[in-house]
């Protein structure tokens, strides 16, 4: 089957490889997409027919652009997050380790296709991680840190970081990402706790940061039963975070929630700045060349004054 529009061009593939990146989107269609992680490919699909079509188009596209891959994994995108399952292997050696390593501008990140629905790296945050390295903050607070990829980007530029996430396993993978890049963790803290509980504690201690990352899940539940809904709780989260931001600090406000478009993020950000009695301007990173217009996470950087 000849690949239809939606697949990246060969020159973009070469550009990624030239900059030391082998983790990125390969194709985006209405009912599915394909991503690359090192030598492996991950297909996300909404319908079985979409999966089969993407598999056939992948082989045709790969032959055309001379792209070699080792394995193909696939995962179904259900309507409810609680129904999400880890990807399944559909092509390749089943005896191989489900873990691999992907690179982004020469930084290494661990990928685990058996750890759950998310494999360890969100490729749509690539330009935001690039911005972190460019700004080179001194102290970064990474909320909902997951596998600490933002912190690795900051640490390679000399920052100290605090990483907060409910999952001890995710933070352990974050430590592994530091080790993959030969970054000692002695100046970095990993806190397995509820972000909404940690922020007030840090404020009481007088902690300040010149960069904060707020990329929460659409929904989460702490071991104590407290829930976080991004649509209703993001403003409260941002107001609390602003108490910890230095005067000229930067705060990333980002979400993958389909119900929150970029304009809604702006409205929330303006309200939160006013509530926290802070002033700032908005900054956006360039669009991702491997994503369609408006695709990927919605993100705004607040540059405080």
Task: Go through each PLM region and give its residues.
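Conserved SAM-binding loop of SAM-dependent methyltransferases across substrates and taxa
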Residues: 147-159
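C-terminal catalytic and target-recognition region of SAM-dependent MTase-like enzymes
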Residues: 250-305
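Conserved SAM-binding motif I beta-strand of class I
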Residues: 160-165
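Mobile active-site "lid"/loop adjacent to the S-adenosyl-L-methionine
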Residues: 192, 210-240
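Non-catalytic accessory regions of SAM-dependent methyltransferases
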Residues: 1-40, 46
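Conserved class I S-adenosyl-L-methionine
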Residues: 136-146
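Non-catalytic substrate-recognition/targeting regions of SAM-dependent transferases
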Residues: 21, 27, 31-35, 54-122, ...
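S-adenosyl-L-methionine
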Residues: 167-213
């Amino acid at each position: 089957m000849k690949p239809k529009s939606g697949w990246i061009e060969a020159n973009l593939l070469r550009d990624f490889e030239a900059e030391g990146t082998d983790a990125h989107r390969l194709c985006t269609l209405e009912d599915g997409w394909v991503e690359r992680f090192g030598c492996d490919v991950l297909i996300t699909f909404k319908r079985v027919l979409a999966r089969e079509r993407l598999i056939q188009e992948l082989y045709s596209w790969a032959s055309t652009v001379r792209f070699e891959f080792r394995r193909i994994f696939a995962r179904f995108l259900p309507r409810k997050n609680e129904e999400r399952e880890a990807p399944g292997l559909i092509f390749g050696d089943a005896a191989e380790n489900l873990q691999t390593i992907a690179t982004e501008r020469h930084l290494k990140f661990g990928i685990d296709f058996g750890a759950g629905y998310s494999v360890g790296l969100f490729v749509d945050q690539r330009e935001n991680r690039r911005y972190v390295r460019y700004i080179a903050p001194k102290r970064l607070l990474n909320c909902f840190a997951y596998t600490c990829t933002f912190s690795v980007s900051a640490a390679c530029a000399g920052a100290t970081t605090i990483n907060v996430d409910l999952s001890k396993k995710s933070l352990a993978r974050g430590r592994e990402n530091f080790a993959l890049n030969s970054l000692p963790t002695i100046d970095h803290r990993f806190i397995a706790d509820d972000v909404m509980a940690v922020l007030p504690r840090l404020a009481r201690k007088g902690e300040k940061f010149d960069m904060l990352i707020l990329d929460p899940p659409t929904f989460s539940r702490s071991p104590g039963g407290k829930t976080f809904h991004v649509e209703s709780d993001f403003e409260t989260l941002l107001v609390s975070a602003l108490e910890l931001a230095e005067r000229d600090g930067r705060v990333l406000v980002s979400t993958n929630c389909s119900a929150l478009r970029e304009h809604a993020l702006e409205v929330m950000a303006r309200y939160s700045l006013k509530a926290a009695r802070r002033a700032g301007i908005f900054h956006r990173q360039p669009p991702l060349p491997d994503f369609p217009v408006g695709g990927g996470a919605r993100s705004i950087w607040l540059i405080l004054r």
